[in-house]
Amino acid sequence: MFVFTVENIKDIAKVVYSQDGMDTKRLKKVEYSKNEGLFKDFNYDKYKITNPPKNTSMTVYNELQYLQDLPEDLEYVKEHDDIKKVFENVCIEHNLKYPKELVDSLLKSSAGIIIDLKFKFNRPRPFQLASHYNIDFGNEKLESMHTPSYPSGHSIQGILIGKVLQT
């Protein structure tokens, strides 16, 4: 059982994904999205307003406990970590032509916006917070886990591609 104390609340409140900020590769993606991509004229400032729950909130604590209780299915997670492959498989399953160039363009154009938002909020990954709450998570780290956790890039890009493909 975890007990909130003044000391651990102060420690938990300070946890961020990174103290280092964005590297050059990520900065180039942000610049591409702002200046060249499909969304170059898209003003996403309104998405910079809504903060995620505080690290010390019961919402975060309950979410971490929920994640801890989920069965680990590494094969499923790895299979669905590749957004392009997921949509390609859905198209194959439904005998539809997979629009590879369009999907590639959507992913490339949205990546910088997502990265910019992620580093604006600098939200720690769940495993970074879990240790402060004495919660044990698996040690498997995916390639997609090398940015702050909020907002979810997989969710944004999955919804974006799904909405475009349904039209």
Where are these regions (language model features)?
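Hydrophobic alpha-helical bundle signature of multipass membrane enzymes
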Residues: 4-167
